[in-house]
């Protein structure tokens, strides 16, 4: 389960940004997950809650967005998009000669903070 490592690194980045803006608490985080990143959203959500315990991000709302992967089909010479790594065939010609062109992995898109004291 590499999701725990991804969440630990994401939390480091979130805490750095929150600290830079004087946050007392992180209230929400938006993360985009690439279709071919091999990340299970349920595992990521569970691990994120786990690593945030005892930090300024504890209890924050996690928003996950799945991103399509852009692929090039060698057979029909077209760009196609796929939403899951489980499908490796071109939706146009059903060939399996796809080359991944763009899949942004895992990105922290937005962090919502609270700057006030409780």
Swiss-Prot record:
Domain of life: Bacteria
InterPro entries (alphabetical): Hydgase_Ni_incorp_HypA/HybF_CS, HypA/HybF
GO MF term (any one): zinc ion binding
Family annotation (Gene3D superfamilies): 3.30.2320.80
Binding site for Ni(2+): 2
Binding site for Zn(2+): 73, 76, 90, 93
Transmembrane feature ranges: none
Keyword Metal-binding in record: yes
Keywords: Metal-binding, Nickel, Zinc
GO process annotations (BP): protein maturation; protein modification process
Family recorded in the similarity comment: Belongs to the HypA/HybF family.
Function as written in the Swiss-Prot or TrEMBL entry: Involved in the maturation of [NiFe] hydrogenases. Required for nickel insertion into the metal center of the hydrogenase.
Protein's name according to its UniProt entry: Hydrogenase maturation factor HypA
Gene expressing this chain: hypA
